[in-house]
Amino acid sequence: MDKYIGIVISVDSAIAEVAMYDMVNDANILWDGQVLPGPKVGSFISILQGNVRIIAKVISEKIIDQQNSIGSKEFDNRYSKDSINRVIKAKSIGTVKGGNFQVTSRYVPMVGNKVSWISQDDYTAMYALGENVPSLRIGEDLLGDQEVNIPIDRIFASHIGVFGNTGSGKSNTLHRLYLNLFKSKYGEYALENSKFIVIDFNGEYSHEKSFGVTSEKKTVRRLSTRSNKSDKIPINDEYIFDPEILSMLFDARPATQVPFINSTLKSYNEKQGDWDGYARFIIGTLLNLLITRDTSRGDALSEWINLYKKFIDTERCDLDYIGAGPNDSYRIYNTQTCDWKYFNRNDSIEIHREYIYNVIFNDLSEALSNSDPIRRIRYIIKFSYIHSTAWGQVQKEHLDPLMKRIDVTLRDLDKIIEVRNDHLQDTCSLFIIDLRNANQSIKRMIPMLFAKMMYGEQKNKKGSGSTSHLIIDEAHNILNANSGELGDHWRDYRLDVFEEIIKEGRKFGFYLTLSSQRPADISPTIVSQIHNYFIHRLVNDLDLRMIERTMPTLDRASFDVIPTLGKGECVVTGTAFSLPVFTIIDWDESDPRPHSDDLVLTHLWVKAEYKEALNKAKDHPHVKKMSKQGMHNWLTSEPNLFSPEAAQYAVDNMRVDWKANALEKAKSCHGTPEEIYSHLISDEVGFTKEEASHAVSRLD
């Protein structure tokens, strides 16, 4: 039966003014033995119109003073019975008809319509995801204390954005989404049929228990440019040896350095695998140097010989016997015939080819064949540098800075990547890349490179029944539309890659999840293409303006609440939901969670016994069913025997939802609701009356 709380007295478009009955003007109302929340800004009311219930959201409230008008010369603020009338404004958001909620403008409030509290059935209809829709719980409604579930298909087959200031709880939300997915009945098959790649800039998700996935199905790669003991990640050679990628990676200048990289990589990619052929190509430079002493750069020959010795890893070779001959020629001492062989300017290369091949060909071809790809490309670029600068085709001064950058960059790359010519099928289903110890250049390059590679592979697998999910924490680090100010010279290419992915990826089963504390820094094109959002507290005007411009599913009233959200609270909105939902995300001390907790100094500055008691409490095998008092009693009894002060410190700092614990305990009890309630508040169990009532009221 409806509980009437007011009547519509004015309508302006979709906004109705409702005069409230006197008995509902408190924060909480006792009605038929139930404690109900009073209507307030942000809550919902139901406007009755025939067999249709118009659901409206309260957006403001005011009072009408019957005793004092605006024109009163003297304001009498003494209370007078029935002189104050409360009026609220509510905006229609949809209707409930036949038990189904629908966003529509077909029905609007009318003056005289009665207003009631929103019923449990109305809440159920509003948050219903459809009949037999697979869903996951992520938390509770902030205002109505209802369970909030998300539709698995409409969320995970979409691009997701998780935004919020530092300390707002966004890391827990990102982790909770995938933790609950992997814990669900669909988790095992999700890990079998899909790839989940996590780009972790701060090492928050790289620990053993992250996402609740065991090491058999999870791989963590901790990349470090500071150490030679870094883990390595697999990169397909067609992506890493792409001229455009290497030009950006080496910060090559467009006028002179990019053409050099392009020509070198073109030659390399054409001859790759034919190392005998490539050895002949490199030796061709040496032969030309030997007969052009008068026209080639003076130190080019010695530079070539020293590079060759480093490449084949030897300190001496027959080429060391090359010296200056008469008339701008070179000569070499033949150790087998004990005489000099001369290289004259007018000689044909063919005259000397066989001799030089006998001296160095086999060693050079073997080095090309056996070197790892990073070392091989490094030396090939250096041989190409000598070839390009020896006769002045390219000014040496133009390429020298590039060669220094190439050395540094490839040295860093060699620490962290393993170049392969196969694909990622053999990697674990959950692949986490920890970049906290990588330098800035690698942090910008690896996510883009991995995303490009994954996206290319997923496009090739279209229709195979598998999907790829790329999860990027602190996404503003690589999707920053203004990062050119930071010396990031290949921002545009990286943004193009991700903009293509977010525009076209859904067609091929490739989905992005982006988390950031600075959404305003991310390219507006990318933010506007996100389908579903989890918005935590944001206070920066630039961030709020970005959200306002790019989220069409967020109404003004919901938007205005964002700066006031508490820790763990967020508004969930997007294409998967019929209306924005204010949610407090589940948080459980005993669940795996990201390593993103704020450092509490006073926890460091307490007695060792206090710390030990807290750790003991967290490790209790039945922590999810314990009451606060029950945990205190356990800590102070045998065999623990902590002091009462240490036990109190532990239970005060556990960050446990004791109401949720009461519900878990109640589910394991048998008997009538009254018997379960009595058991929960008993001295043995120790839940409070409020916690016990909460639990019993939610039992099926």
State each model region's role.
Residues M1-L129:
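Conserved ASCE P-loop ATPase motor domains encompassing nucleic-acid-directed helicases/translocases
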Residues L181-K185, M453-K459, D492-L512:
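Substrate-engagement module of ASCE P-loop NTPases
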Residues F201, F510, Q517-R518, Q529:
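Conserved H-loop
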Residues G203-K209, D237-V497:
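P-loop NTPase motor domains
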Residues S215-L223, T525-R537:
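A short helix-turn-beta junction within AAA+ P-loop NTPase domains corresponding to the substrate/partner-engaging
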Residues E609-D700:
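An alpha-helical, amphipathic repeat domain used for nucleic-acid recognition
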